[in-house]
Each structure stands twice: as C-alpha cells, then as structure tokens.
From Swiss-Prot:
Cysteine disulfide partners in this protein: none
InterPro entries in UniProt: PPIase_dom_sf (IPR046357), PPIase_FKBP_dom (IPR001179), Trig_fac (IPR005215), Trigger_fac_C (IPR008880), Trigger_fac_C_sf (IPR037041), Trigger_fac_ribosome-bd_bac (IPR008881), Trigger_fac_ribosome-bd_sf (IPR036611), Trigger_fact/SurA_dom_sf (IPR027304)
Chain intervals with Acidic residues compositional bias: 451-479
Entry's family note: Belongs to the FKBP-type PPIase family. Tig subfamily.
Top-level lineage group: Bacteria
Gene field: tig
Record remark on domains: Consists of 3 domains; the N-terminus binds the ribosome, the middle domain has PPIase activity, while the C-terminus has intrinsic chaperone activity on its own.
GO annotation, cellular component aspect: cytoplasm
Keyword Cell cycle: yes
Protein name: Trigger factor
C-alpha cells in the first residue's frame, strides 16, 4: 500500500492511498465467507457454497462493494499511522478508482492537529488578585450559620419580604391547564428569587388561604418561553427567628466553646476557599496568557461541529422550535444573534485551548499515571453520587474514558505551565504555586471540596485501562 499527504491548510490534509488488489485478498476471503453464511444455495451447507456460485448469485460488484466497506477503515488507519498524522474528527473518504484485479485508490480529507510555535514557558508572567479575607467575609459566614440554626414560627398577617411561605401553584397557557406546573405545599422564601418571575410580587400582601393570578413567562417544560397565567395560593406564612450570637450558639453550631474560636476557624476556612479560588484564577489566567501569545490555527469543521452541538442541546428541550428559542432568549435579555456570536466565540476558545494544551503536553512529554486517573474518578464519582468503580464502568461502556484521559492530561499540562511561569499578585508579591501546581501533579485547584478528607480509597485503574485510554486519545473531545 502506498500513501501520500497533501496539506490543504494548517489544520486539514488530504491522504491519497493506493492499495494493490493482491493486498485485498484477505478482505475478499472475508467478504465471501460472510456471503456464504447469509445466502442459502441448494445442495450446500451454510458457509460451504463455492465462490463462483456466490458471485454468480450476487454479482461481482456486490462483492467488491463489501470488500471496499471492510477495507477502507483499516487502510485509512494504516495510512494515518505511517504518515504520523494526528486526526481530529472524522475523515471524508472518497473512492476515486476501483479496478477489479488491479488496485483500489481512495482519498481521505481530515482535520489534523496543527503545528504550533510554542512560547518559552519560563518567560510567562501571570498576575492575579491577592487573597484577602475581611471581617465582612467572616460576618457573612456567621450570618449564614445563624440562619441555618434559626427556627420558623407561624404568623397571622399578610406575607412580607423575607417570610417563608407554603404555596400551591397552577398555570394555564391559552386557557389550557399546564399539568407539570401544578404543585402543592411548595416551600418558598420571599425575596430569594429562586422561582418564577413575578411570584414574590404576587404573594407579598396575601394572607393565609388567599390567592392571586399573575402573568409570567415559563422557563422550563413543554411550554418554556410561553406566557402563562399562574395562580398562587398561600397556605401558611412563617418567619425565621434567629438565635443569639453568643458562646451558647457557638457550642450549638460547631465543635467550639466560644464565638472567638468559631470566628477563628471560619477565618481559616474562608482563607482556604479563597486560596483555592486564587489557584483557579491562576489556572484560567495561564490559559488566557498562552492564548494571547500563541497563534493556534483553527480547524473550521471541528469548530462548526461544536457550534452545532451546542445549538442542538440548547433548543432540544424546546422541541427544536426556533421561534420558542428566540422568545426564550429575549426573556433572558439576549437574542439569537448574540447567542450565535457567543456560541462561536466559546467554541473557538475551547478548541484553541485544547489544541494548545495538547501541543504543550506533547512537547513536555506529559504522562498520565494510574493515580492521576484514579483521583479524577474519585472526584467525578462524588459529583455524580456514584461509586468510583461504577463510574469507571459507565465511562468504559460509553467510550468516554479517552476524553477523560485527555482532560486529565490537559490539567497536568496547565499545572506544568503554571509551575514554570512567574506568578505574582497585583501587589507584586510572588505566589508559591507548589501546593496546587507543583511537579507532583496535584489537581487540588480543580477540586471544589478543598479541605475535605480525601482518605477514602481510590478506585483501582488497571494499567491496561490507562493504556487503552491513552491509545484512543487521537480524536478526543475536539470532535
């Protein structure tokens, strides 16, 4: 087999492949064996009919068509390997010549990872805000804790902002009931803005067992984006009574004996949270600086595929009704033009970032170990409420392990970038990034649950599983 490559653009190539007919003999044998199992000829057991009779029955053209269908994927993969290409996305294959007993010639156009001129990572400078914990931050935590230990007491008066109410809801669209909008005994805090627009205004001033109907736009379900007449009935009204902020409260709400001890502990926790947030800002800034300093050619087909996928997901819940989608965007203060522009910009940035991180990972020879995969699986299993081993099986069944592998590798790459760069805060103080971005590959910056006990046993990821994920990482989530 011979193959050559034409560079159509920095991100797209055409592979020309010539396969001598002699090399197709195994594929021809396979095609005849399949036909022999499918076709029953008088006087022959299944699978035993001779080639000539099978060919006479179905025609030589049908046999060659089967041969081509079987041969193309394998020969394409061989050409990609021999030419050391890194495809992203699926190829467009065209058979340009098929001469019986002579040769098979086909072309394959495919997007590939571009060559990227990478900057010297040691020259990168990253600047972020310093970690600042104020007394107001601590008092906000105290207030939240105080509310958590408050008690609700019923009152006999019209509802006011800040009250807790139990309500019944129903809705109609064009005079017809909306079953999914009907609910009873729903608890709601007035002023929280957590439910539909206009609800709080309708409830305020109502007394127990009083109702009011108002007009609003539904944001979910079959009628999302449509105007509806919503009726709310107040069933009960309660106020929250807060405990005194004294040492007795500290003992009730924590393991500490005094409010001073509680405040000191909260200051440590807030500092830790803000330190993690700073690490996340460092990570994001590192990517931003790299994108500013590096030219990354974009594969248009890959960008368009991601744009289309995002749009599909956005309107899927609206039965792909473009008018309802436009109405929904309008209610959010946006428009289809703004959505499309943001969608494309986000897709371009995401794909540029992925290609850039992959190029740096290749240059730095970033390796993903079993521990790296195990840590990510444990983190993801917490987020999804699954056992790590159960999540691993789901990822394998859905062929999502390579995408996870690629994401972990990019995370390790960002850590390496940050560790090599100079990182300071806006006050000019250099920041020690070792904890989150050190050579150990600690992924703590990506873990929201900083400070939690990570002593639970990590899922065992076999070497074969890790190797399979690595080998499949050729057409990952840039598709």
């Amino acid at each position: 087999m011979k193959s050559t490559v034409e560079k159509l653009s920095p991100t797209r190539v055409r592979i020309n492949v010539e396969v001598p007919f002699a090399e197709l003999e195994p594929d021809i044998d396979k095609a005849f064996k399949q036909l022999a199992q499918q076709i029953r000829l008088p006087g022959f057991r299944p699978g035993k009919a001779p080639r000539k009779l099978l060919e006479a029955r179905v025609g030589r053209g049908a046999v060659l068509e089967q041969v081509v269908n079987d041969a193309l994927p394998t020969r394409y993969s061989q050409a990609v390997t021999s030419e050391s290409l890194q495809p992203i996305g699926q190829p467009e294959i065209e058979v340009t010549k098929l001469e019986d007993n002579e040769e098979l010639v086909f072309t394959a156009e495919v997007d590939v990872r571009p060559e990227i001129d990478l900057p010297d990572l040691s020259t990168l400078t990253i600047t972020v805000d310093p970690v600042s914990v104020t007394d107001e931050d601590i008092e906000a935590e105290i207030e939240a804790l105080q509310k958590r230990f408050g008690t609700l007491t019923g009152v006999e008066r019209p509802a006011e902002n800040g009250d807790f109410v139990s309500i019944d809801l129903s809705a109609t669209v064009d005079g017809k009931d909306v079953p999914e909008a009907k609910t009873e005994g729903l608890s709601h805090e007035l002023g929280s803005g957590q439910l539909i627009e206009g609800l709080d205004e309708a409830i305020i001033g109502l007394s127990e067992d009083e109702s009011k109907t108002f007009t609003t736009t539904l944001v979910a379900g079959e009628h999302a984006g449509r105007e509806a007449e919503v009726t709310v009935t107040v069933k009960s009204i309660k106020v929250r009574e807060l405990p005194e902020l004294d040492d007795e409260f500290a003992q009730l709400a924590s393991e500490f004996d005094t409010m001073d001890e509680l405040r000191a502990d909260l200051r440590e926790k807030v500092t830790r949270v803000k330190t993690v947030q700073q690490a996340e800002a460092i990570r994001d800034k590192a990517i931003e600086v790299l994108l500013e300093q590096t030219e990354v050619p974009l594969p248009e087909a890959v960008v368009q595929a991601q744009v289309d996928d995002t749009l599909h997901n956005a309107i899927h819940g609206l039965d792909h009704d473009e008018d309802r989608f436009a109405d929904s965007l309008k209610e959010q203060g946006s428009s289809r033009e703004e959505f499309d522009a943001d969608n494309r910009a986000n897709a371009e940035k995401a794909i540029k970032t992925q290609l850039l991180m992959d190029a740096i990972a290749d240059k730095l020879e970033i390796q993903v170990g079993q521990n790296d995969l195990s840590e990510r699986l444990v983190l993801m299993s917490r987020q999804y409420g699954l056992e790590p081993q159960q999540l691993l099986q789901m990822l394998q069944q859905n062929n999502q392990l390579p995408a996870m592998f690629a994401d972990v590798r990019r995370g390790l790459t960002v850590a390496a970038v940050v560790y090599a760069a100079t990182v300071t805060d806006t006050d000019g103080t250099e920041i020690d990034t070792t904890e989150f971005f050190g050579p150990s590959g600690d992924q703590a910056a990506a873990q929201q649950g900083a400070g939690e006990d990570d002593s639970e046993a990590a899922v065992e990821v076999s070497e074969d599983t890790a190797d399979d994920a690595s080998e499949d990482d050729t057409a990952d989530d840039t598709k």
